[in-house]
Structure formats: structure tokens, C-alpha cells
A protein has these predicted regions:
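Phosphate-handling substructures
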Residues: 69-117
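A generic secondary-structure signal marking the coil-to-beta-strand transition
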Residues: 1-2, 104
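Active-site-proximal alpha-helix that buttresses catalytic centers in soluble enzyme cores
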Residues: 3-6, 10-71, 75
Length: 117
């Protein structure tokens, strides 16, 4: 068995430097083109299942890949993005101003200890 992990394409939050967690933000036009390109790369790969987060940005990509193989994506809640609390949708500049200690910990070797505000 081979498992491929694929990240969704660009969203407005990614493009604009905003934190993105569980907000259901769709792909931009560029992100959709990226998703279509990924689906094209999987056209010749044997795919028997496509699993996805329920968020639109991931489900769009999963749907494109699955369609190439006459499959339907299977939604798994456990694949939902990390809940980033108050920082969801916030610019990194705003995060630095409001939560400097959090960002310092998050960027450190002990980043796994960081608690989302």
C-alpha cells in the first residue's frame, strides 16, 4: 500500500498571510488550478481511495483526484485542520502584536508546546 498526503491549494488566507485553521475558506482561482494540476498528476497513479477533511479547500482537491478514478472522496473528520483558536483569519503582524509569547514558543524547538490562544 502507498499513501500519498497532499495539501490543498492556495486560499485567500494563505495568499494574504493570514492564519488558517478550521475556517472553511475556499480555494482561490490559483488554488483551483493547483488542485487541477495535482489531480492530473494522479491520473496515471493507481488510486483506490481518496480521504479528505470536510473543509471545502481539501474536499475540492479530493473531489478532483477522485473523479479521475471514478471514486467519491471519503470525508474523515479526523483530517480536519488544527483548531488555531483566535488566530484563525488573523494576519501574522496582528498575531505578533496580540500574542508575542505564543508565536515565540510556536517558532521554537518546543513549538509543540505552544497553546493556541
Amino acid at each position: 500500500m502507498t499513501l500519498y498526503l497532499v495539501r490543498h491549494g492556495e486560499t485567500a488566507f494563505n495568499r494574504d498571510g493570514q492564519g488558517l485553521g478550521r475556517k472553511d475558506v475556499p480555494l482561490t482561482e490559483r488554488g483551483l488550478a493547483q488542485a487541477e494540476a495535482v489531480a492530473g498528476r494522479f491520473a496515471t497513479v493507481k488510486v483506490t481511495r481518496v480521504l479528505s477533511s470536510p473543509l471545502a479547500r481539501a474536499l475540492t482537491l479530493a473531489g478532483l483526484v477522485a473523479a479521475r478514478h471514478q471514486l467519491q472522496p471519503e470525508v474523515m473528520e479526523s483530517l480536519t485542520e488544527l483548531d488555531i483558536g483566535e488566530t484563525d483569519g488573523m494576519s501574522f503582524a496582528e498575531m505578533r502584536g496580540r500574542f508575542p509569547d505564543f508565536l515565540k514558543t510556536w517558532a521554537s524547538d518546543d513549538g509543540w508546546r505552544a497553546r493556541m490562544p
